[in-house]
């Protein structure tokens, strides 16, 4: 086991957390708990009050369309409602079932079992004039549905299983080379040739999910929940997603997206996938040596640090940015929808081929936008960095109703985004994918419940097995004495210490991290014999 762990580094420096690093769920002060509960209730109200066709949430407060990704978050919110006292068990289950049955019974909104990004808020008809059948929005919808199915079981889960079994992901795999990438990657979307025939003949968009960021990983992962391999994708697609490398200004190595530095790109998959307990993966073992071993929770923590540092340094002197105004991510802004972001300093990958292994150079300059900060971004960062709580406290205390509308008197809590320049601005619209991300991220930071519900579903367990991913009951690396990382400190850990005895920098058996495996490490393991309970999720 120890040899395997050391080999995980491969030819590239791995992205691993410090041994013993704390992972969520976190313990919050009572005042912060109260604020987070209120914020979640506000987001829940937005997701269940601004409804349209079939009881589904509108994409935005006054939007003419429904986003299927937003519906996924609505279903996840309903799964959480009984524990919070927002709805009774029967009310939440009934609402979830009604939405799922409406989707199953609505014609023309799915092609090969995947869903149009947008459907009409009044009629439920697909809106190909807005966008096509979206793989990532379908993935977000399925993820939220899985959470609801896992939580309620029964007829709700029967409907979820019907949806998952109908999805033919193989029809969204590009069969030709696109932009220098070989065939086999998932397309972003399918579009009809004739908008009047939304599920007639059509073509896949010649753009693929190719990088191992959160939209890509969640989409590729959900494709593996299909038990019929003829309707799934190659499990190696997970490992083939390229991992561009960069260094943050603080000198930390990260995998990054060459197309967008917006923070949402680093956490949307982890709203559902329990990376704190999944630990690092190892593409080199799967035949992809130009993809580094990555603990994606740690990767997102480093991105959060990079965004925070950028906001504090604020080289352009923009309003809002600072210790209480970060990260930079996609949101509404005073000038419309904006996608600011932060990039690391690009680092070459030895032996990499372009563009299959790493992007062509250039095009990754930081974009601070106009300083607008989206509250859901801070909530997402809270899953990785507890200092994001400073942003949530500050935004709550801004002159109401600039950013906060009190849920206890009918408000929806945080507004989508705010900017303190020119007398102050905040978004008048609520976005379902932002409110949903905020609610789910805070739940994971507080309890990890969404992670548990998602991974409890047998179709998710199937996907984990298909790809070759594992999940522990404790936080990966949470107990330094657990040398072989199996959540139990036992005789095998003692043997691992003895086998690595001596000067051995970087060895997992170097419990006290002094670059030598010695008697003090052996004593530490002996003293800790028993289960590792660090980061265990509540039942």
Q: What is the role of each PLM region?
A:
Residues 1-7:
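Bacterial N-terminal signal peptides
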Residues 9, 474-539:
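Cellulosome-associated attachment modules in secreted, modular CAZymes
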Residues 10-476:
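Ser/Thr/Asn(+Pro)-rich, low-complexity disordered segments
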